[in-house]
UniProtKB/Swiss-Prot annotation:
Transmembrane segments: none annotated. Gene3D superfamilies: 1.10.132.30, 1.10.150.390, 1.10.1790.20, 1.10.40.90, 2.40.40.20, 2.40.50.100, RNA polymerase II, clamp domain, RNA polymerase Rpb1, domain 3. The keyword Magnesium applies. The lineage of its organism: Bacteria, Pseudomonadati, Thermodesulfobacteriota, Desulfuromonadia, Geobacterales. One of its GO terms (biological process) is DNA-templated transcription. GO terms for cellular component: DNA-directed RNA polymerase complex. It comes from Geotalea uraniireducens (strain Rf4). The keyword GTP-binding does not apply. DNA-dependent RNA polymerase catalyzes the transcription of DNA into RNA using the four ribonucleoside triphosphates as substrates. Its cofactor is Mg(2+); Zn(2+). It is an enzyme of class 2 (transferase). Mg(2+) binds at D460, D462, D464. Zn(2+) 1 binds at C70, C72, C85, C88. This is DNA-directed RNA polymerase subunit beta'.
Length: 1377
């Protein structure tokens, strides 16, 4: 009877378990779970299509093929449920059990599991301490292994070849036991005592002398400990019986024509069963050992192929020559179980169609074709039809809908009301790629999209398609409306600025109506009110752009009215403005930037609702006025500057001059190339500037007859100036000159295209330009994939960074200051601290008042206070220093950028960070496509000019005065500052080695005065004293080559790498006596030359202090675009060591040079106190410090890029984070992309989660072990409580791939990469996945523990209060990122 009740049971709830454990299965476990042994390789009978008994599809083992019907047909239907048929042995139950019942195959001989054998490092090999090669020999019957040495003194598990085995037999007789194959290995594994081995290994580790031995022992100890703690037995890695997958998961489908399509697994299983049966028979017949061995080996290979085909030897191929898909392949990769079916599923109640623009829609609406709506809302329609009494049964409702009767459309209108749908455009790169709208029924078959949300979807209407999804349950509808409605997503989660901003036509229209025109109709009139302007405009008494004065009410404060100078167009625009927004916001020419600012200001002052209304009105007014303006462009709008020929002529002269210098041998080819490119880059800029000046100014005749220059209404200029379409770069190509083009290799072709598109290109110029443009297209295709992969890795590493508590109570934070480059402020401190939380009280430096109390969010008003107080540094809380154990606290994160207030609990900030960094990556890859391959490259900076006036101050600059009286800088970390009257430092510049300083200390200078100049393309080596040049070890053909230039016929001396390690090319300066000159005590005038240096002096020539004796050419610059950028971002996040990274000093101290060791230079840094540190620097690398220099910790001793791991080790986590944040930001900044720092910090935090154990103390940790920081801290606390010695660890920087793979959750790691490896390791450790991250919960089919899925939102109690006029309490907004 209870069976009947079970029938109506709900399926198992995915929520009633809290964790998942994975471990190695024992043979007993496999048999216990199995429903019977599969003995025959047969599948189904080809005539009756019924499964063969004991075969791979046997109904007795796996259950009936038809619901409640046994195989022979004796028992049919529900009434016999649960009976086992006595004839065919089949149980009468539903056929879906064929999806879950396992069978098994008993193997005639044990077989090794290939994952534990071949998945590196080999676990079986590690445990037994045998190399993989030897292990394979034993398993594949080519060698013997000692299973029990007894008292012969042989080592346990020693591997013998056939000959050695015969010898040992002769020597010891039968006093030892050895065997081959998996059975022997199983014996060995079974006889191992893990506790004894673990103790032995610990002793070995303490006694180990070499690092390599210690590491090897530690690895082995790890495996032993894993087995000990997990309760897995080592012999289970050898299989005695293998499970057989349920038949429905490896189906056999009859095709028409009597053939069958089958899963590859059936072939693989069949192979195993055949070989196993044959082996059983041979063993019964007592066949010769050779035959049996061969059959055993074949069985091992068959099982290997079943588990992981192709892992060992050649993959077994099916009849069509393609390798069969094994069980591992079913899990792995993009089309494996994890990524194809568990993380991304296809859903019903969805549709897709082409999109068209819907300019008359409101922001929260989208147009849904009637056909689609009818299909999507079917169940709701049926329900309504029945409710209204139009039909009585579902069947008749179905018929009615199919006939599309008029009532159906009425019902559809009703159903659709207030029921939001979700629109999604692939690729969904950030959360704004799916937004919710209220559907509006439309005719036609295309979905209509509101123009303002195109930016977020990155959609255009050239044939893009979008998908519609329908949220069904009430909860999902509420979430969709509250969190995903387009009207609730006005701000971008990446940078907190509005993303719903008018673009293109709308911008142009608003720009046109807010421009002012000199001497227009009605110029200078004065109006009494806004309405009066409107009347005058409608009566055509005043021009839209006339400059007039109007008396306006001050709506913001209700003060007395103001008279403002403005234009009728701006007054019209004011009509749609909310009262809270001041008129000054729009009383200017409204470009796209200004519009974005307007939406932002409106959001802050007037709130969400008003902003949405404003956005819609801006859309309408923008379209309206761009139509009225009727702006169009003609070829005459592309005005070519008159000075163009002169500029090009001048540039050509300069290029000739440089060519001559090169011919005379004054400069190298590299310098010549760089200088030529610089000249052309500058000329192109110059022409562009003149052209833009021309376009933006018109000359008109004023009423008094004078000619006046006024801003022009040139259409092309208006489009670019307003930001609606086109850029200065594109206009430059239309009317200036195209400029330099790039080769596909990224080098710049030195002959520029001097023509523009209006003049037309010659054949050669056209050819050069197609060269670069094609590269752009090819790149785009390739880079999109790379960028997608970067996003995937970022999401994976950050998916479990969730806001878990309000305040972690940390006392630590970051100090933030304005970001400057070359003395120029790139990002003001205000932009960097907005929306962050203050760490301590922020005080006014003058009055000492508290500007911002500690733990308070710094909002826009506070930022203004801080900036006006002139604070240069502010301490804020940061994700990096957050002490939350799991996740991040709200105070350390600060403002939720997309909502404009402090972040809510449960927000998935990690995923948002990953999307914010990944999304522009994909966008930027598309960027090259539009410029068309013109080389974009900044001319290098060669000099410094003062930006402010003041007095000069030298900071840490050593200089000598050369023969021309210039100060030449002789050290690297010098800085030059300009101090104003009050003694405040106005600007500060780092001065490079070898620069000429044009000013002297304490001199008063004016703005724009030259301070210093240098050659950006070479790095000079200068002499500090005068004297006579002598070469040392500069031997032609050994350490130096005379390179003859083919063009000029001149030779120059270049230092090359020598085979002789003792040869050290150097230039020595001798004094009059012929001795090496002393610079100062202990420092000689000896200069070592790195590989690649060009020697610029002759032997025995006389040099003065500050003269260049050799030059090291810098790289020729390539175009800087995001291609350089994306791999750079990936390199930073993967924490790769750069190719030639610089050795950095770990301490502060003074540099001296020691004796060379092993052909490397020895640099010694001596601190004021404590031990000196020695560094070896490879020969041929240029050492950038000099004897007697004072270096700071973290400073590079040689040329090269920084290695993030060194920065972490020497300067600590904060400096590393600062370095990573700044480097990543620089790449994006070059492209003009804004990303908030906190996103990059979130990713860096995830990269720094782990520590590496240096000393174990009294803890149970192992040396060199890598583990999560808080596990380490817990273990230390435990030991300290008992009075033991704690372990010592160093922070560890993991790249994002490594960090994702080393997460606690094995499910998440397995679904990311290296599935087999992750699962193998996890099963040996008996890992428990406590389902804390997002991915593992998605895979298990549960709600994610973020946003509304947080436990604290699940168990809310709703209490209805007595409504005695009490207003309900506001509910905290629930956010699900």
């Amino acid at each position: 009877m209870e069976d009947i009740f079970n029938f109506f049971d709900k399926p198992k709830d995915p929520l009633h378990f809290s964790a998942i454990r994975i471990s190695v299965s024992s043979p007993e476990k496999i048999r216990e779970r199995s429903f019977g042994e599969v003995k025959k390789p047969e599948t189904i009978n080809y005539r009756t299509f019924k499964p063969e008994r004991d075969g791979l599809f046997c109904a007795k083992i796996f259950g009936p093929t038809k619901d409640y019907e046994c195989n022979c047909g004796k028992y049919k239907r529900m009434k016999h449920r649960g009976i086992v048929c006595e004839k065919c042995g089949v149980e009468v139950i539903p056929s879906k059990v064929r999806r879950e019942r396992l069978g098994h195959i008993d193997l005639a001989t044990p077989v090794a599991h290939i994952w534990f054998l071949k998945s590196l490092p080999s676990r079986i090999g590690n445990l037994m301490d045998i190399t993989l090669k030897d292990l394979e020999k034993v398993l594949y019957f080519e060698a013997y292994v000692v299973t029990d040495p007894k008292n012969t003194g042989m080592p346990f598990a020693q591997v013998f070849s056939e000959d050695q085995y015969q010898k040992a037999l002769e020597e010891y007789g039968g006093q030892f036991e050895a065997g081959m194959g998996a059975a022997a290995i199983r014996e060995c594994l079974k006889s191992m005592d893990l506790d004894v081995i673990a103790d032995q290994l610990r002793v070995e580790m303490l006694e180990a002398t070499s690092e390599a031995k210690r590491k090897k022992t530690a690895k082995r100890l790890k495996v032993v400990e894993a087995f000990k703690s997990s309760g897995n037995k080592p012999e289970w890695m050898i299989l005695e019986c293998i499970p057989v997958l349920p038949p429905e998961l490896r189906p056999l489908v009859p095709l028409d024509g009597g053939r069958f399509a089958t899963s590859d697994l059936n072939d693989l299983y069949r192979r195993v069963i055949n070989r196993n049966n044959r082996l059983k028979r041979l063993m019964e017949l007592q066949a010769p050992e050779v035959i049996i061995r061969n059959e055993k080996r074949m069985l091992q290979e068959a099982v290997d192929a079943l588990f992981d085909n192709g892992r060992r030897g050649r993959a077994i191929a099916g009849p069509n020559k393609r390798p069969l898909k094994s069980l591992s392949d079913m899990l792995k990769g993009k089309s494996g179980r994890f990524r194809q079916n568990l993380l991304g599923k296809r859903v019903d109640y969805s549709g897709r169609s082409v999109i068209v623009v819907g300019p008359e829609l409101r922001l929260h609406q989208c147009g849904l074709p009637k056909k689609m709506a009818l299909e999507l809302f079917k169940p709701f329609i049926y329900n309504k039809l029945e409710e209204k009494g139009y039909v009585t049964t579902i069947k008749s409702a179905k018929k009615m809908v199919e006939k599309e009767r008029p009532e159906v459309w009425d019902v559809l209108e009703e159903v659709i009301k207030e029921h939001p749908v979700m629109l999604n455009r692939a690729p969904t790169l950030h959360r704004l790629g799916i937004q919710a709208f209220e559907p509006v029924l439309i005719e036609g078959k295309a979905i209509q999209l509101h123009p303002l949300v195109c930016t977020a979807f990155n959609a255009d209407f050239d044939g893009d398609q979008m998908a519609v999804h329908l949220p069904l349950s009430v909860e999902s509808q509420v979430e969709t409306r509250v969190l995903m409605m387009s009207t609730n997503n006005i701000l971008s989660p990446a940078h907190g600025k509005p993303i719903i901003v008018p673009s293109q036509d709308m911008v142009l229209g608003i720009y046109y109506m807010t421009r002012d025109k000199y001497f227009a109709k009605g110029d200078g009139k004065i109006f009494a009110s806004q309405e009066e302007v409107r009347i005058a405009l409608d009566a055509d008494e005043v021009d839209l752009q006339a400059r007039v004065k109007v008396r306006l009410k001050n709506l913001v404060t209700d003060d007395k009215p103001l008279i403002v100078e403005t234009t009728p167009g701006r007054v019209v625009l004011r009509e749609i403005l909310p009262d809270a927004v001041p008129f000054a916001t729009i009383n200017k020419v409204m470009t796209k930037k200004e519009l974005s600012n307007l939406v932002d200001v409106c959001y802050r002052l007037a709130g969400n609702k008003e902003t949405v209304i404003l956005a819609d009105k801006l859309k309408s007014i923008g379209f309206r006025y761009s139509t009225i303006a009727g702006i169009s462009i003609s070829i005459n709008d592309m005005v070519i500057p008159e000075g163009k020929p002169a500029i090009i002529g001048r540039a050509s002269e300069e290029v000739k001059e440089i060519q001559n210098q090169y011919t005379e041998g004054l400069i190298t080819d590299g310098e010549r190339y760089n200088k030529v490119i610089d000249i052309w880059a500058k000329s192109t800029e110059e022409i562009a500037k003149e052209m833009l000046d021309n376009l933006s100014r018109d000359i008109v005749v004023a009423p008094d007859g004078k000619e006046v220059k006024v801003p022009s209404f040139n259409a092309i200029h208006m489009m670019a100036d307003s930001g609606s379409r086109g850029s200065a770069q594109q206009i430059r190509q239309l009317a200036g000159m195209r400029g330099l083009m790039a080769k596909p290799s990224g080098e710049i072709i030195e002959t520029p295209i001097t023509a523009n598109f209006r003049e037309g290109l010659t054949v050669l110029q056209y050819f050069i330009s197609t060269h670069g443009a094609r590269k752009g297209l090819a790149d785009t295709a390739l880079k999109t994939a790379n960028s997608g992969y970067l996003t995937r890795r970022l999401v994976d590493v950050a998916q479990d960074a969730i806001i878990t508590e309000t305040d972690c109570g940390t006392l630590d934070g970051l100090t933030v200051s304005s970001l400057t480059e070359g003395g120029e402020v790139i990002e003001h401190i205000g932009d960097r601290i907005l929306g962050r939380v203050a760490l301590d009280d922020i005080l006014d430096p003058v009055t000492g008042d508290v500007l911002v109390p500690a733990n308070e969010e710094i909002d826009e008003t506070l930022v203004q206070k801080i900036e006006s107080a002139g604070l240069e540094k502010v301490k804020i809380r940061s994700v990096l220093t957050c002490q939350s154990r799991r996740g991040i606290c709200a105070k350390c994160y600060g403002r939720d950028l997309a909502r404009g207030h402090l972040v809510n609990m449960g927000e998935a900030v990690g995923v948002i960070a990953a999307q914010s960094i990944g999304e522009p990556g994909t966008q930027l890859t598309m960027r090259t496509f539009h410029i068309g391959g013109t080389a974009s490259r900044r001319a290098e900076q060669t000099s410094l000019e003062a930006r402010n006036e003041g007095s000069i101050k030298f900071i840490n600059i050593n200089y000598v005065t050369n023969s021309e009286g210039h100060h030449i800088v002789m050290n690297r970390n010098g800085e030059l500052a300009i101090i104003d009257e009050t003694g405040r430092e106005r600007e500060k510049y780092a001065i490079v080695y070898g620069a000429k300083i044009k000013v002297s200390p304490t001199k008063l200078i004016k703005q724009g005065e030259a301070l210093a100049e240098w050659d950006p393309y070479t790095m000079p080596i200068l002499t500090e004293i005068a004297g006579k040049v002598k070469f040392g070890d500069i031997l032609e053909g050994v350490t130096m080559e005379e390179q003859v230039d083919e063009v000029t016929g001149l030779s120059r001396k270049v230092v090359v790498e020598s085979r002789d390690a003792d040869k050290r090319p150097r230039i020595t300066i001798k004094d009059e006596t012929g001795k090496t000159a002393k610079i100062h005590e202990g420092t000689m005038g000896r200069y070592y030359l790195p590989v690649g240096a060009n020697i610029t002096v002759q032997e025995d020539s006389i040099v003065n202090a500050g003269d260049v004796i050799a030059k090291i050419p810098r790289e020729t610059t390539k175009t800087k675009d995001i291609t350089g950028g994306l791999p750079r971002v990936a390199e930073l996040f993967e924490a790769r060591k750069p190719k030639d990274f610089a050795v950095i000093s770990e301490i502060d101290g003074v540099v001296t040079f020691g004796k060379d060791a092993k052909g490397k230079r020895k640099v010694i840094v001596t601190p004021d106190m404590g031990e000196p540190k020695e560094y070896l620097i490879p020969k041929g690398k240029h050492i950038s410090v000099h004897e007697g220099d004072h270096v700071r910790a973290g400073e590079a001793l040689m040329d090269g890029s920084s290695n993030p791991h060194d920065i972490l080790r020497v300067l600590g986590q904060k400096e590393l984070a600062k370095y990573l944040v700044d480097e990543v930001q620089e790449v994006y900044r070059l492209q003009g992309v804004k990303i908030n720092d906190k996103h990059i910090e979130t990713i860096v935090r995830q990269m720094l989660r782990r520590v590496r154990i240096k000393e174990v103390g009294d803890t149970t940790l192992l040396i060199d072990d890598q583990l999560e920081r808080y596990i380490f801290e817990d273990e230390n606390e435990r030991v300290l409580d008992k009075g033991g010695r704690p372990a010592i660890a160093e922070p560890l920087l993991l790249g994002i791939t490594k960090a994702s793979l080393s997460t606690e959750s094995f499910i998440s790691a397995a679904s990311f990469q290296e599935t087999t490896k992750v699962l193998t390791q996890a099963s040996i450790e008996g890992k428990v996945d406590s389902l804390r991250g997002l991915k593992e919960n998605v895979i298990m089919g549960r709600l994610i523990p973020a946003g509304t899925g947080l436990a604290r939102y699940r168990n809310l109690k709703l209490v209805v209060e007595d409504s005695g006029g009490v207003s309900p309490q506001p509910v905290e907004e629930v956010s699900a990122g």
